[in-house]
UniProtKB/Swiss-Prot annotation:
Keywords: Cell membrane, Cell projection, Collagen, Developmental protein, Differentiation, Extracellular matrix, Glycoprotein, Membrane, Neurogenesis, Repeat, Secreted, Signal-anchor, Transmembrane, Transmembrane helix
Protein name, as recorded: Gliomedin
Source organism of the structure: Mus musculus
Pfam families reported for this sequence: Collagen (PF01391), OLF (PF02191)
Known partners and oligomeric status: Homotrimer (via collagen-like domains). Interacts with NRCAM and NFASC/neurofascin. Interaction with glial NRCAM enhances interaction with axonal NFASC. Interacts with MYOC.
Length: 549
């Protein structure tokens, strides 16, 4: 028990000691704060006394200055005004509003001026000047200062009373179009207008389904008409060789001629060493010689010269033509686009360059860029049909000719580059029509025309596919076909001989759209329409090249 009591008294003593230590720390902090506040108060009191002393000095200076200035303001009333001499009066004219007050000078007044330097508030000086009615200790006026910056614009004034109406002015320019107003009421229907011109002929529609089989008709009467002989057909293939004929009678005895050198001897090479039992080799040699120098072979084109541009127009497709038969006729005809009904007729080449023309109206719409002019007549394809029209200038009634088994619709063109189904060509041998067969849909055919009867004399199948052709022309009875890019002549066909001829030469360098290509025998030039450029190409024949050698 005694030990427990001692332990309790020891714990109580330690608690009292901790409390006393905390109270001592708080007292020390309080004393330190009090000392700090007293120091700050003393500093602030000293600063306040200094400010009050400075303010007292300023007030005393202000009161002294006010008393001095008041004394100065009362001094001019007691001093008599001295008489002014003319020079003094002239010097004192400094105001336009009146004569200014005389200046106080030390020489004429029994006064002593004392100048002191002190700091005077600006507000005090302003109040002094206002109270003395303009009498200030200022010097003479200085020069006028620069003009100040422009002020802000003032407020708009109120509208004035409307004036009298003036005279009517001149009519002004037409103003801008105003906003569209509300739609008006529906008016009464107008009178029926005149019937317009017919539009361009469209392409034929697709073939319809076959109709139902009709009833059997009545038996017809027996005809006594004599059937006319049809046109001459194509030449058939050569037949097989026939049997040898009987031996002929012996010939008359002749003197033996000289033996040709190097013939049938041991030194001759190749097939010439074989001794023939007939004249086969001799005949073949003669045929080759005749073919090499035949007039038709010499009519071939060897080359095409550099082109010359005649005119540039806007239309990509078109045709320009000159008379082929009559050399004295200088007229030029132009059709624009690959479909239309109007033809421009120019008097001559200068009229073409100056765009001076006469407009001709055709009886039927044309289609394509394969027209031709021959003996004062225009030959062209009637759009939407397999008909060729011959329109003689100066007459109203045209002539027509139908070509059976020819493609003329569904954009199955003969030449896709020029959108042409039929190409009419005129050369030294007559009038030709180049077209595509509808039987196989690919071969190029040529029909020869009889100008007098305007009928077909023969059809020639070249067997050349139109898919490989870009354009074509006929010169001296030979058909020439270009490639699909119209840069080279890759095929030739002898229309009179009915056989293909080897031909492969350059035509042009450009790859523009070749809408029209035609040979004119009048000047032996190729006429072309290339993307709006009207061009001329000189032609070189084999006969001319041989004569130059």
């Amino acid at each position: 028990m005694t030990r427990a009591a001692e332990r309790g008294q020891g714990a109580t003593g330690w608690g009292l000691r901790g409390a006393l230590v905390a109270i001592a720390l708080l007292s020390a902090l309080n004393a330190a704060g009090t000392v700090f506040v007293l120091c700050q108060w003393r500093g602030l009191s000293a600063a306040l006394r200094a400010l009050e002393a400075q303010r007292g000095r300023e007030q005393r200076e202000d009161s002294a200055l006010r008393a001095f200035l008041a004394e100065l303001s009362r001094a001019p009333g007691r001093v008599p005004e001295p008489s002014q001499d003319p020079m003094s009066a002239a010097r004192n004219k400094r105001s336009h509003n009146g004569e200014p007050a005389s200046h106080i000078r030390a020489e004429s007044q029994d006064m002593m001026m004392m100048m002191t330097y002190s700091m005077v508030p600006i507000r005090v000086m302003i109040d002094l000047c206002n109270s003395t009615q303009g009498i200030c200790l200022t010097g003479p006026p200085g020069p006028p200062g620069p003009p100040g910056a422009g002020g802000l614009p003032g407020h708009n004034g109120s509208d004035g009373q409307p004036g009298l109406q003036g005279p009517k002015g001149e009519k002004g320019a037409i103003g801008k179009r105003g906003k569209m107003g509300l739609p008006g009421a529906t008016g009464n229907p107008g009178e029926k207008g005149e019937k317009g011109d017919a539009g361009e002929l469209g392409l034929p529609g697709n073939e319809g389904p076959p109709g139902q089989k009709g009833d059997k008709g009545d038996k017809g009467d027996v005809s006594n008409d004599v059937l006319l002989t049809g046109a001459k057909g194509d030449q058939g293939p050569p037949g097989p060789p026939g049997p040898p004929g009987p031996p002929g009678p012996p010939g008359s005895r002749r003197s033996k001629g000289p033996r040709p050198p190097n013939v049938f001897n041991s030194q001759c090479p190749g097939e010439t060493c074989v001794i023939p039992n007939d004249d086969t080799l001799v005949g073949r040699a003669d045929e080759k010689a005749n073919e090499r120098h035949s007039p038709q072979t010499e009519s071939m084109i060897t080359s095409i010269g550099n082109p010359a541009q005649v005119l540039k127009v806007r239309e990509t497709f078109g045709t320009w033509m000159r008379e082929s038969a009559n050399k004295s006729d200088d007229r030029i005809w132009v059709t624009e686009h690959f479909s239309g009904i109007m033809v421009k007729e120019f008097k001559d080449l200068p009229a073409l360059l100056n765009s001076s023309f006469t407009l001709l109206h055709l009886p039927h719409y044309f289609h394509g860029c394969g027209h031709a002019v021959y003996n004062n007549s225009l030959y062209y394809h009637k759009g939407g049909s397999n008909t060729i029209v011959r329109f003689e200038f100066g007459k109203e009634t045209p002539q027509t000719l139908k070509l059976e088994n020819a493609l003329y619709f569904d954009r199955k063109y003969l030449f896709a580059n020029s959108k042409t189904y039929f190409n009419i060509a005129v050369d030294e041998k007559g009038i030709w029509i180049i077209y595509a067969s509808s039987v196989d849909g690919s071969s190029i055919l040529v029909a020869q025309l009889d100008e007098r009867t305007f009928s077909v004399t023969q059809h020639i199948n070249t067997t050349y596919p139109k898919s490989k052709a870009g354009n074509a022309f006929i010169a001296r009875g030979i058909l020439y076909v270009t490639d699909t890019k119209d840069t080279r002549v890759t095929f030739a066909f002898d229309l009179l001989g009915g056989k293909q001829i080897n031909a492969n030469f350059d035509f042009r360098m450009s790859q523009s759209v070749l809408a029209m290509l035609s040979y004119n025998m009048r000047d032996q030039h190729l006429y072309s329409w290339e993307d709006g450029h009207l061009m001329l190409y000189p032609v070189q024949f084999l006969s001319a090249a041989s004569s130059q050698r």
